[in-house]
């Protein structure tokens, strides 16, 4: 996954998130409350600022539109934002309200209390005019738009309506993280991402089962004239309902949750980037689910980077397979490939006997892995090897060959086939990249036409001279004869 070419216009309520860490060791003599002995303080952008931070951490670029006060927290916020390469500060300063500041007091890795500094003043006409001007000035550079509504005033009706209408006129998708119960305010959005509670409040419908989630999402979708609703469901994962199609569920992976602060920001950031890169919403949902899984395991308003998201996707794959077996069945391999493709990953395929692993094999596997995001290796089973190589082969049985192959870092999955060629397996899996050694001509590669017809490609990898299993066996036999 590479999001470096994607720019997201982030519009919404920005705030300064302040975390004050301390220790609670006694009860106050003045009242029955704990005494917090203060230690270090950490500050970071929150609200739509955290959305932008997540976009940057995932490798994208962000343009940030919101309101800040002419005050010390506002200066601190802009100072933090100025330290982030890839971020364009399009914030509007106002003297009518303070910068929103949320201070969380933390002891023993738990929030003790939160103190909020904010104004309940409605958005003023001059503030709305300035925000709309900032949107108009920067939307031409955006590939996707995110509206992050924390119900703090920035996402007033005129701002929302203008942002969505302007984006739609340019063919730019708009993703909305809602706070309002009136989803009609987000009319025309491409995708709205409520949590389950927000979806229930917006529709007045139950959301306990998958069927109820779908019914509520369709009701919300109709009110907002939206293309899709993606509902986050905490430990139940996520549910995507699109205007055309049924409900799609991705489960959450069991983990220890330290802090859910800002998890919704991570979801919409990852979702928008993935969709902006060309993934379907279903594929983007898998990426967003993995990113959220990373940040809830961290304390405070956190972000996830690409390496963490890929590792989480791998862990989810392993969970779905019930562990990490050395050798997958054909059905398991097909399921695994489908999951990888749903995540927008390019799946590579190579095959062979791989009887005695040598440096030439490793070089081939490394080249194959460089050509894709996930590599599946198909091994000839023992009977197939014997037909191809003779009755004395294989030297190592399939189970041993699979264990060795699965332990090689370039390999993501191993499957076996019993036919003389892997053609039927290739038809089943439909890899994006088919890799063979450069000793083959393109017209000699089994399955090349199948892969190309499906939009994939064939890669011929260079081989290392003088490296082969047959030669290795010959040297072993010669050495054994010399010892006798």
UniProtKB/Swiss-Prot annotation:
Pfam families: CTP_transf_like, PfkB
Homology family: In the N-terminal section; belongs to the carbohydrate kinase PfkB family.
Protein name (Swiss-Prot/TrEMBL): Bifunctional protein HldE
Binding-site residues for ATP, renumbered to this chain: 195-198
Broadest EC class assigned to this enzyme: transferase
HAMAP family in the cross-refs: HldE (MF_01603)
Sections of the chain in a coiled coil: none
One term of GO molecular function: heptose-1-phosphate adenylyltransferase activity
Region of interest: Cytidylyltransferase: 349-484
Alphabetical list of PANTHER family matching this protein: BIFUNCTIONAL PROTEIN HLDE
Biological process annotations from GO: ADP-L-glycero-beta-D-manno-heptose biosynthetic process
Pathway(s) where this gene product acts: Nucleotide-sugar biosynthesis; ADP-L-glycero-beta-D-manno-heptose biosynthesis; ADP-L-glycero-beta-D-manno-heptose from D-glycero-beta-D-manno-heptose 7-phosphate: step 1/4; Nucleotide-sugar biosynthesis; ADP-L-glycero-beta-D-manno-heptose biosynthesis; ADP-L-glycero-beta-D-manno-heptose from D-glycero-beta-D-manno-heptose 7-phosphate: step 3/4
Chain intervals for the UniProt region annotation (Ribokinase): 1-320
EC number in record: 2.7.1.167, 2.7.7.70
Record note on quaternary structure: Homodimer.
Catalytic activity: D-glycero-beta-D-manno-heptose 7-phosphate + ATP = D-glycero-beta-D-manno-heptose 1,7-bisphosphate + ADP + H(+); D-glycero-beta-D-manno-heptose 1-phosphate + ATP + H(+) = ADP-D-glycero-beta-D-manno-heptose + diphosphate
Keywords assigned by UniProt, alphabetized: ATP-binding, Carbohydrate metabolism, Kinase, Multifunctional enzyme, Nucleotide-binding, Nucleotidyltransferase, Transferase
Gene3D superfamilies, sorted: 3.40.1190.20, HUPs
GO cellular component, one term: cytosol
Active site per database record: 265
Domain of life: Bacteria
